[in-house]
Amino acid sequence: MSRPRVFFDITIAGKPTGRIVMELYNDIVPKTAENFRALCTGEKGVGKSGKPLHFKGSKFHRIIPEFMIQGGDFTRGNGTGGESIYGEKFPDENFKEKHTGPGVLSMANAGPNTNGSQFFLCTVKTAWLDGKHVVFGRVVEGLDIVSKVEGNGSSSGTPKSECLIADCGQL
């Protein structure tokens, strides 16, 4: 079984910046990987929130240099929303994969078993998140674009410029 690859085309302050390509661990965390894949394609239509179940047009709302870039809140855009393809939240699948370094793709949450659509891409090793956040993929191309997004962050997490997922899908 080959692992699916998905992409984000990023704009920063309205300017096209480049593409991030991610490989999803559907063999390790199939439910988590499928949620993210379908949110990249938008194939599931409209969610319970009334908003499309799609990352396209959403932004990285929390960017902390030397830590991570976080996005996936396509319902509210500020970190308080988001929705999975399974309904609002779904359980932690497993913690087999670890936060080993830059490019690790992991689920953001509000405690155990609260996965929705919010995710983060690590920019450094974040071992303290092991066993708390489900790792479900990694960046295979465009780590330099992740760094450009990271460069628009702040210690508070508030972005200096709008970092947008202008387009996304499956390769």
Swiss-Prot record:
One of its GO terms (cellular component) is cytoplasm. Residues 7-170 form the PPIase cyclophilin-type domain. It comes from the Eukaryota. InterPro entries: Cyclophilin-like_dom_sf, Cyclophilin-type_PPIase, Cyclophilin-type_PPIase_CS, Cyclophilin-type_PPIase_dom. Keywords: Isomerase, Rotamase. GO terms for biological process: protein folding. It catalyses: [protein]-peptidylproline (omega=180) = [protein]-peptidylproline (omega=0). GO terms for molecular function: cyclosporin A binding; peptidyl-prolyl cis-trans isomerase activity. Its EC number is 5.2.1.8. Pfam families: Pro_isomerase. PPIases accelerate the folding of proteins. It catalyzes the cis-trans isomerization of proline imidic peptide bonds in oligopeptides. Belongs to the cyclophilin-type PPIase family. PANTHER family: PEPTIDYL-PROLYL CIS-TRANS ISOMERASE, PEPTIDYL-PROLYL CIS-TRANS ISOMERASE D-RELATED. This is Peptidyl-prolyl cis-trans isomerase 7.
